[in-house]
């Protein structure tokens, strides 16, 4: 599997250390193993996980500004775990309301020796982000309106919201509440992934 990952990374123009590649493959192996009992993802094939979970997450890394991030509605750790592996100098809080997902993430943290993630079981509305985060990240979590409404208390004044989307959500962008603006929209190129991918970056006015 590490050879396929290396080939995908090369196609995407992403350079990682051998240790980072081993951690990413280790994460996929754990996800595949735990998925049988815990139903953590609808993707069953580890090779597909490399594309749809690993590559689809780490292509976002160059766009992230700051050192403290929170991944809301992280599920089994997406995109937070792959991002933590490829950016070891940053810290990622992984927030989910389901205990089985957080238990899985704590096992990932232990087995992969990831000291820059903190799994937390909580609803996002009830989680106090202190000190404020540099960035709030979500992937398949909610509409842009719901994201900024539910998570408005988490980023600092200069913090940003990073929403991973498929087709560009023009209706969601038009429905953003007052006080928030789209700072940037980046098409994301994910090798072997069909369909469009976009990163929408939102800042406060």
Swiss-Prot record:
Catalytic activity line of the entry: guanosine(527) in 16S rRNA + S-adenosyl-L-methionine = N(7)-methylguanosine(527) in 16S rRNA + S-adenosyl-L-homocysteine
Sites where the protein binds S-adenosyl-L-methionine: 73, 78, 124-125, 139
Superkingdom, taxonomy of origin: Bacteria
One Pfam assignment: GidB
GO MF term list: rRNA (guanine-N7-)-methyltransferase activity
SUPFAM superfamilies with a match to the protein in the record: S-adenosyl-L-methionine-dependent methyltransferases
Main location, first listed in the record: cytoplasm
Similarity comment text for this entry: Belongs to the methyltransferase superfamily. RNA methyltransferase RsmG family.
Function text: Specifically methylates the N7 position of guanine in position 527 of 16S rRNA.
Protein name (Swiss-Prot/TrEMBL): Ribosomal RNA small subunit methyltransferase G
Species: Erwinia tasmaniensis (strain DSM 17950 / CFBP 7177 / CIP 109463 / NCPPB 4357 / Et1/99)
Phylogenetic classification of the source organism: Bacteria, Pseudomonadati, Pseudomonadota, Gammaproteobacteria, Enterobacterales
Protein encoded by which gene: rsmG
